[in-house]
Amino acid sequence: MGDLPGSGSTAQPRDAAVTGTGGNSTAGGGSSVGSTAVDRPPSPARLSHTSEKHPKVTLTELNMLRRHRELCDVVLNVGGRKIFAHRVILSACSSYFCAMFTGELEESRQTEVTIRDIDENAMELLIDFCYTAHIMVEESNVQTLLPAACLLQLVEIQDICCEFLKRQLDPTNCLGIRAFADTHSCRELLRIADKFTQHNFQEVMESEEFLLLPVGQLVDIICSDELNVRSEEQVFNAVMSWLKYNVAERRQHLAQVLQHVRLPLLSPKFLVGTVGSDLLVRSDEACRDLVDEAKNYLLLPQERPLMQGPRTRPRKPTRRGEVLFAVGGWCSGDAIASVERFDPQTNDWKMVAPMSKRRCGVGVAVLNDLLYAVGGHDGQSYLNSIERYDPQTNQWSCDVAPTTSCRTSVGVAVLDGFLYAVGGQDGVQCLNHVERYDPKENKWSKVAPMTTRRLGVAVAVLGGFLYAIGGSDGQCPLNTVERYDPRHNKWVAVSPMSTRRKHLGCAVFNNYIYAVGGRDDCMELSSAERYNPLTNTWSPIVAMTSRRSGVGLAVVNGQLYAVGGFDGSAYLKTIEVYDPETNQWRLCGCMNYRRLGGGVGVMRAPQTENYMWCENSFKQPNS
């Protein structure tokens, strides 16, 4: 072990006076020869100390006294249960007890006080909290704890209970939690429950709680501009489901409720064929008037400026966030079919339906809100088959026409409504072939080939051009870049990257093309650079935290994510995100599977039961 600073020499006290042999010292006119005198350092005037242990130790001792019923000066009688305590502790923790014991109330002079309208178990938990600063809120006690905390004015416990209930929100219970919050004047919880209900209305309307709503609460919900629905038809259907749950008692409220359905925003077909033909609607004069009003709005567009009102105002549904899909790839020595979805708002990866085939080196892109997986290698053979994923149904279909060539390590992108497959290899040679898919015709057709054969190529669309970036010509990695102009069916070279890269990740972000990772002649890369189409130049950005070949790169909700890959020794399941403001990458979670050569695609979060809006997050049911 190394010496401490100053070791090897003898240090003297700062205020020591040393007199050596042959020296002179004068004190009070005398002298001393050959002696050493050491003066004591002056004592400090103050020494301040604050104990961090004291509050906890004191509370612990006070609680022990309470447990042993020592020095207790009050007994709380709650539901027949006697709880011993100290007035000073209760008064310090609770405004309710402080007012009781320090004022002129009769209880201030009593040694036993009866507390009514409170659950005895909840009271015991709250008294324990006063002495220990600890409480466990759970599903079995929150409905008694919250009203008890409200009564005793224990604001901290009220907040904890509300936070717990906020985390429990789902479409089957949000209306009950909303009513509970309203009853106990928990305004923040009420606001969040309202917002959750509005944003997840399509799922809430199918719950039993919705069918049991009092008419006033139903009106409060459906009159909101923030109701998140695809069309006003859903609101009408929800109202009629509620009505028909108990027609005998509720038909009297139909007009009151229907006036908050925005009938003028319905399609003419639905208004006439469904609303206008409903027997309950037709039998109520006020309802018929509402239908006629909507018909006039639809039939007389020139009069609409004079007919504006709450029923003609479009709702403002929530803008759904984007989610990232990681598709296929190579893991643990084999191609995989698994697919998972990343939600940046929760930072969670969730498995979704797998593809029908294992695919590594797969090309992935999103066209018309559907996710396409193109080609790849299944571990035994090269593929030309295509699969298409619908996030609304969580299902893959294989009814897409195959590409004209088998392709793995292929680049895939969407330009002008067409899906392009660029380069790759077919098991015999590296390809420069390019073809595009027309979803209306379910047909692939060839376009002009690239000037260079490229496998492990990255592709990007910017400014109406399709860029093919890097890759390998079958012999060595490339730094060359070319772009395709669909108007002239022609490829033209642009400035090369500063680094040769194959199996790189590529994405368009803030009007730049970002190229990250990949592999050069020698090793996997962590470096990254970006292309400015205005100046036709590449410039470096900060390197990723890991080397990544076979990496996926995508922009999700305005952030750039690098997903998976291979670092030279291990397949990766980590992801990292780039911040252009700080020019830094940071790790932000892991996939369920390690993936090399998987594809990535970005879509709007679907409106299904698997996506539940909650304050600043999406919540999985029963998770």
Curated annotation (Swiss-Prot):
SMART domains: BACK (SM00875), BTB (SM00225), Kelch (SM00612). The modification Phosphothreonine is found at T19. GO terms for biological process: negative regulation of synaptic assembly at neuromuscular junction; proteasome-mediated ubiquitin-dependent protein catabolic process; protein ubiquitination. Pathway: Protein modification; protein ubiquitination. Residues 72-139 form the BTB domain. Keywords: Actin-binding, Kelch repeat, Phosphoprotein, Repeat, Ubl conjugation pathway. Pfam families: BACK, BTB, Kelch_1, Kelch_KLHDC2_KLHL20_DRC7. This is Kelch-like protein diablo. The gene is dbo.
